[in-house]
Amino acid sequence: GNKTVKQESYSKPKLLEFNVRFGDPETQIILPRIESDFVDLIESAIDGNLNQVKVEFNKDKKLVCVVMCAKGYPESYKKGTEIKNLEAVKKIPDVNVIHAGTAFKNGKIVANGGRVLNIVASADSFKEARNKAYEAVNLIDWEDGFVRLDIAKKAENF
């Protein structure tokens, strides 16, 4: 699982949380690689016989997820800031914008959380997937958003 540890110079580390599940970005790069019928997998899990099912994955597809966050996240950040030009991303093949912290207000898409958009790109290489994801990020017009620039950087040669 994932654990979040807070380290303060004047005290010992404190365990803040321990997650035994994947978060959104992790899930959003695993699910598209599943080639098995997802409904069959869910039904097998419900019936308690998932151990009898072989899950088929596309091992060749490489995926990268870049999370667009509201400036100030994870501390304080503004809600209600408009996000524009999302439709332009549709021109990039094999890229999806997954809304995580958005709302639809007065006919506009606005930020409604800290982690706002997940940009998922797939390609034959991590370098190509990474380039597509950041190309999409650069098309999105959101003054109050930011991304980390190091996502999948170390995986570019794979």
Where are these regions (language model features)?
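Generic C-terminus detector
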Residues: 103-106, 111-158
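Fold-independent oxyanion-binding glycine-rich loops
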Residues: 1, 17-18, 69-70, 100-102
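Conserved metal-phosphate-binding beta-hairpin within the catalytic cores
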Residues: 1-24
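Structured core elements
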Residues: 14-15, 65-67, 118
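Generic long, charged, amphipathic alpha-helical segments
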Residues: 79-118
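A glycine-rich phosphate-binding loop feature that marks nucleotide/adenosyl-phosphate handling sites
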Residues: 1-6, 56-67, 150-156
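Active-site "cap" helix and flanking loop/linker of ATP-utilizing ligase/carboxylase catalytic domains
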Residues: 19-92
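Conserved active-site and cofactor/substrate-binding residues in soluble primary-metabolism enzymes
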Residues: 13, 25-29, 33-41, 61, ...
